[in-house]
């Protein structure tokens, strides 16, 4: 059977309309995931054991269960407890950001632990407050070291965002499926969707390498 894009080409603008939703989901989820990931990483390196246990348990749960399960619990399960339906967009953001935070926290923790311990000891000896030490000394160095890993997590988040199609959110993937249903040809719209995601990943990869080169030039 030959590929025939004649019926799919008119559907491309419809598929591209889902790009705005995809990008909004990724950007909002990435920001929330990064903030929560920083908090979790600080809990993991703290000396207060309950914080360590909570952060490790959180990471274990969200890394040890499928993202699609987490999304379906948020969208289909939580309303059963809360008594009201959660908006599709925010259900997607909650699930993706909570999942991403688990991975980001491990990346940041590793970045902080890779910094020479002598710097932390010197800051403590000089009486630098913990918050100021983290904000001005350790976190900037950690982010400099882990920027490639953070970009990789953003790329993963971009690709995983396609999973929101299971709750009917009109992203690129969902619209590609709808275009296939309208034309009775599913492969061609899915190829178009694949190309869109591929271009997004290429752009993020280019940005990540540019940032990495910039950071190296500042060393």
Swiss-Prot record:
It is a multi-pass membrane protein. It is found in: Cell membrane. GO terms for cellular component: ATP-binding cassette (ABC) transporter complex; plasma membrane. One of its GO terms (molecular function) is transmembrane transporter activity. Gene3D superfamilies: MetI-like. Residues 19-208 form the ABC transmembrane type-1 domain. Its main location: membrane. Disruption phenotype: Cells show impaired growth on arginine as the nitrogen source. Keywords: Amino-acid transport, Cell membrane, Membrane, Transmembrane, Transmembrane helix, Transport. CDD domains: TM_PBP2 (cd06261). The chain crosses the membrane at residues 19-39, 51-73, 88-108, 149-169, 187-207. One of its GO terms (biological process) is amino acid transport. Signal peptide: none annotated. Part of a binding-protein-dependent transport system for arginine. Probably responsible for the translocation of the substrate across the membrane. Belongs to the binding-protein-dependent transport system permease family. HisMQ subfamily. This is Arginine transport system permease protein ArtQ.
